[in-house]
Regions:
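Alpha-helical transmembrane signal-anchor/signal-peptide segments
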Residues: 108-128
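Loop/turn elements at helix/coil->beta-strand transitions in domains of secreted/extracellular proteins
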Residues: 135-136, 161-162, 186-189, 334-340, ...
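Membrane-embedded segments
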Residues: 141, 145-229
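Secreted/periplasmic serine-hydrolase-like ester/acetyl group-modifying domain
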Residues: 209-335, 424-427
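N-terminal Lys/Arg-rich, disordered targeting/topogenic segments
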Residues: 1-85
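Hydrophobic membrane-insertion alpha-helices, especially the h-region
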Residues: 87-108
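Active-site segments of SGNH/GDSL-like serine hydrolases
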Residues: 328-354
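C-terminal regions of proteins
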Residues: 355-427
Length: 427
């Protein structure tokens, strides 16, 4: 028995010595770079099938902080392969330039030209003018018709004053009306555009511009400045309608059963640095593109949303928007602001849709009566009718100049006490 015990102990000692030797050899390989992963220290016990069993797994077992308490982990080192990095950088720059140049050439051939973006940052820049000492000026708010149809250079030529353009496409002017009503620094004249479909429904696809303006930070301002001065005047493709993601989304993808097409409105306008805007020439001159614009309007004339799918619901929505306008106008007039509503022209199916859903008698007439504010409706003035509107809703660029030249004298003569300089010749 003693002989057997001593043999077992000797065998165990030999096994432990062998394991220690193997671990030492493996760690020596690690030190020489033959193995790229740290191993356990020689003789360290690791969990295994048998208590106290020792083993080494070169390339798999890594020391951790728990194996070496109080000792910092080694910093991982990763070799960078030797490559012609200068040539790779040059090739990347050339490839990027070719792709950008190709994308720019494609959209220029399509008819695009460099122009300023109709962004929240651009709107906020104009809105800040009121709080920076220009609160007594004429301000234009409304939807896209005021943006397209009222031309600032023509207004300036007739009155000597260039208004501040704050109209927003696809957005009820009630929001801007309320925003200005809450700003005591605004004391000037206010022209409020009324597009029945938007004003009396409260629809506002650009509603986020108001919190953006009030919370705009330095980084957003600097980003808008860089965009406006370095990118927008140079690149024609730098427009949301030409973004690759937008182009992919508007492809004719198959639609699931029961879905109705609801396309985003395509690019329709070109904008200047101070948000003076006019219709893009492609809408006027390209019959195929004009047909696309019209077809998108027809999609929007379909089934009403659940909040307006009965006459009672619709009337409630209309009354709510008029209530909001009444409250905002009262604040403005209390501090001497002269307010004037404007219903710009529309034609064809668009006009028919507005007359059917938002007839004048239950919308426009009620708005004027309840607010006590005068208004100019294109139906009441022959000189505001008969203009070319390629996609039924907005005036062409040349017609917008003619419309503004007819509108401003009406405002001066019949509604606003003018303190501006006399008409100045065009520059």
């Amino acid at each position: 028995m003693p002989s057997s015990t001593s043999n077992s102990e000797a065998a165990g000692s030999d096994a432990a010595a062998t394991a220690a030797t193997q671990a030492a050899q493996a760690n020596a390989e690690l030190a020489s770079g033959a193995v790229g992963v740290p191993l356990t220290a020689p003789g360290s016990p690791l969990p295994g099938p048998g208590a106290g069993e020792h083993f080494v797994r070169p390339g798999f077992v890594r020391q951790t902080a728990s194996d070496r308490p109080g000792v910092a982990q080694p910093v991982p080192v990763r070799d960078i392969p030797v490559q012609p990095w200068g040539l790779i950088l040059l090739a990347t720059v050339v490839m990027t330039a070719l792709l950008i140049g190709g994308w720019e050439a494609y959209w220029r051939a399509y008819g695009a030209t460099p122009g300023y973006r109709n962004s929240n940052g651009e709107w906020a820049e104009q809105r800040r003018r009121i709080d920076a000492g220009e609160g007594g000026k004429t301000v234009l708010i409304g939807s896209s018709r005021v943006l397209f149809d009222v031309q600032l250079p023509v207004w300036e030529r007739i009155t000597g004053e260039r208004p501040i353009q704050l109209a927003l496409q696809g957005t009820s002017s009630v929001l801007a009306l309320e925003d200005l009503a809450d700003d005591p620094k605004f004391t000037g004249h206010l022209l409020v555009g009324v597009a029945p479909e938007l004003f009396f429904s409260g629809r506002a696809i650009r509603a986020d511009v108001f919190p953006y303006y009030h919370k705009q930070g330095p980084s957003q301002r600097s980003g808008n400045w860089l965009s406006k001065h370095l990118l927008e005047p140079v690149f024609a493709f730098y427009d949301p309608d030409f973004a690759l993601g937008t182009v992919v989304r508007r492809q004719p993808w198959p639609m699931r059963a029961g879905m109705h097409k609801n396309s985003d409105v395509r690019k329709l306008l070109v904008q200047d640095a101070d948000r003076n805007s006019h219709m893009w020439r492609k809408v006027e001159e390209d019959p195929a593109y004009r047909a696309i614009a019209r077809s998108i309007w027809l999609e929007h004339f379909g089934k009403p949303p659940p909040t307006m799918d009965t006459p009672q619901k619709l009337q409630k929505v209309i009354d709510t928007q008029i209530d909001r306008a009444v409250a905002a106008v009262a604040k403005l007039r209390a501090r001497g602001v002269q307010v004037l509503f404007l219903r710009p022209p529309s034609i064809g199916p668009y006009y028919a849709f507005e007359q059917h859903v938002f007839p004048r008698a239950t919308t426009w007439d009620v708005l004027l009566r309840r607010t006590g504010v005068p208004g100019i409706h294109f139906e009441d003035y022959p000189q505001l009718q008969g203009y070319d509107q390629p996609e039924w809703s907005h005036l062409s660029a040349s017609e917008a100049n003619r419309f503004t030249a007819a509108l401003v004298p009406i405002i001066k003569a019949d509604y606003w006490v003018s303190t501006a300089a006399p008409e100045v010749p065009p520059r």
